Amino acid sequence: MTNPANKITDDLDDLLNVLPGSITSALRGVGRFDELIEIVMDLGRTPESRYASFADPSQAELILRREEVSLDDLAFVVGRIGDFDTDNRAGITRTLHRISGIKNRRGAVVGLTCRVGRAVYGTIGIIEDFIASGKSILLLGRPGIGKTTMLREAARVLADGKRVVIVDTSNEIGGDGDIPHPAVGRARRMQVSKPSMQHEVMIEAVENHNPQVIVIDEIGRALEAEAARTIAERGVQLIGTAHGQTLENLMSNPTLSDLIGGIESVTLSDEEARRRGTQKTVLERRAPPTFDVLIEIHARNRLIVHPSVADAVDAILRGRVPVTELRYVDAAGAVQVERT
C-alpha cells in the first residue's frame, strides 16, 4: 500500500491580508509557511507564530516583533473578519482559516488566535480501507494533530459515490461563508447556528436529507453522543472526531464513553466470578459501540487503529492488551502496517 504525494491548498494570502502589515512582513521574513500552525496576538504582549517543528522543538514558537500588540492591531484584524459567533470564532469566506477571540468581561477583544486551515488531499491514504468499508469511524488526537484535515478529506473522497452530509459546527470542515470550500468535494454542508444546537442539526441531517454518511467534528457533549448513537442505529455511516487522545481516555470520560458502548459496574454470580477468576463486581461494556473503528492519531502519518472497538473495550476491561494496528508512512512513502 502506498500513500500518494499530498496536494496542499492553504489560501494563506487571505489570512495574511487580515493581519497588521508589520506582522505579515515578519511572517514572510521567517518563511516556513508549510509548518505554520497559528499566529497568536494578545494585548500587551509580543505577537508569536507557532509551527509544527518536529525536528527542533525550540523552533516551534517565534516572536514576530518586539513591539507589543496594541488595541489598534486587534481592531485591524477584527475589522476585516467581521463578527464573532457565540463560540468566539470567526473565519474568512471561502477559506479554512479560523480566528478565535479572547474577550474581557466587558466583551472587548483582548486576544486573537489565527489558526491556519489547510486542505491536504491524500491524507486518508493511510486508512482508506477503513473509510471505504462503510463502518463508522472515530478519530482521536491532540489539538492540531490533523483530525479535521483527515475528516475533510474523508468527506471529499466518500462524496464521489455516496450521499455525504457534513455537520459543520464551527465551519472548520467546509470553511467560512455559505459556499463550502472545494476541499469537501460534492459533500453537502449543514451549518450550526450555535454549538449547543449541534445535536439537533445532526438529527435534522438524517431526517431531512437522506444521507448515507454523516461527518461531524468535535463530539463533546452527552446530547451529541446520544445523537450519534441514534444516527448509527439508523444504518448511517458516521465519521467523526471527539475530545481525547486514546481509547482509554474515552473509556474514563463519563460524558463520551457512550460512543464506545458505555461502561457499567455489574455483579457476577459466584460461579461466573470463579470461572473468570475475578471479583464479583466488575466493569463491563453496557451496549454496542456507536463507532465500529477507533483511530488514535499520534503524529502526522502515524496512527494506532482499533479495528474492533467492541473487542478492544472488552479486552481492556478484562485486563488484556487489545488487538491494534500501528500504521505509518515510511521514508519511501509506503504505508506500513504492524499488527499487535
Task: Label every PLM stretch briefly.
Residues 138, 163-167, 191, 213-217, ...:
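Short hydrophobic alpha-helical runs that function as membrane-insertion/retention elements
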Residues 158-205, 251-261:
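P-loop NTPase switch/communication element
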Residues 46, 95-98, 104-106, 120, ...:
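Conserved nucleotide-binding/hydrolysis micro-motifs of P-loop NTPases
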Residues 265-340:
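Conserved P-loop NTPase
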Residues 116, 127-172:
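P-loop NTPase nucleotide-binding module
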Residues 65, 77-137, 177:
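P-loop NTP-binding catalytic core
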Residues 1-95:
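N-terminal accessory targeting/assembly segments
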Residues 210-211, 215-271:
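Conserved P-loop NTPase nucleotide-binding/switch module
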